[in-house]
């Protein structure tokens, strides 16, 4: 591992220790609370939509959220470790078989829906077991 990769890994570990980032995948509906500066004031705005992609790794990791606002599709790319993100909440888990859901851009109405992933008791316990090991 070269020096730059080592520095990026250390920085990502440091930032992840400070901030709690939930585990989510493309297809999940997420609410991202973003800090917005307007002049000398700062407020928090919620942006809720479907995560259609995750890209990068470490410090450079980002995700794309798509929502429909007044009949128009709006997409926004957020860096996971951005200081402008106050929190990320997973509202719904979706069942998809793709890592990138760009095909949703061409879909309208019911065909753009994503089925909800059913959480069983075994799948809820599984992540806890992985973190202990």
Swiss-Prot record:
| Cited Gene3D superfamilies | 2.30.30.790
A GO molecular-function term, please?
A: structural constituent of ribosome
Region Disordered: start-end pairs: 114-133
For this entry, list what GO says about its biological process: translation
Ranges annotated as biased composition (Basic and acidic residues): 123-133
The transmembrane segments are none
Q: Which UniProt keywords apply?
A: Ribonucleoprotein, Ribosomal protein
Reading the lineage from the top rank, the first entry is Bacteria
One Gene Ontology cellular component: cytosolic large ribosomal subunit
* Free-text function comment from the UniProt entry: This protein is located at the 30S-50S ribosomal subunit interface and may play a role in the structure and function of the aminoacyl-tRNA binding site.
Question: Belongs to which family?
Answer: Belongs to the bacterial ribosomal protein bL19 family.
PANTHER family cross-referenced by the UniProt entry: LARGE RIBOSOMAL SUBUNIT PROTEIN BL19M (PTHR15680:SF9), RIBOSOMAL PROTEIN L19 (PTHR15680)
Q: Which HAMAP family match?
A: Ribosomal_bL19
Q: What name appears for this protein in its UniProt entry? A: Large ribosomal subunit protein bL19
Q: Which organism is it from?
A: Phenylobacterium zucineum (strain HLK1)
Q: Which gene encodes it?
A: rplS
């Amino acid at each position: 591992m070269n020096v730059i990769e080592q520095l990026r890994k250390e920085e990502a570990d440091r930032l992840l220790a400070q901030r709690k980032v939930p585990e989510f995948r493309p297809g999940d509906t997420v609410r991202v609370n973003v800090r917005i500066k307007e002049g000398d004031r700062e407020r928090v705005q919620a942006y809720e939509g479907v995560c259609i992609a995750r890209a990068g790794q470490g410090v450079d990791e980002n995700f794309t959220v798509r929502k429909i606002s007044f009949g128009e599709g709006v997409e926004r790319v957020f860096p996971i470790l951005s200081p402008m993100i106050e929190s990320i909440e997973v509202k719904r888990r979706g069942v998809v078989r793709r890592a990138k859901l760009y095909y949703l851009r061409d879909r309208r109405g019911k065909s753009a829906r994503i089925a909800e992933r059913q959480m069983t008791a075994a799948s809820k316990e599984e992540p806890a077991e992985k973190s202990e090991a």
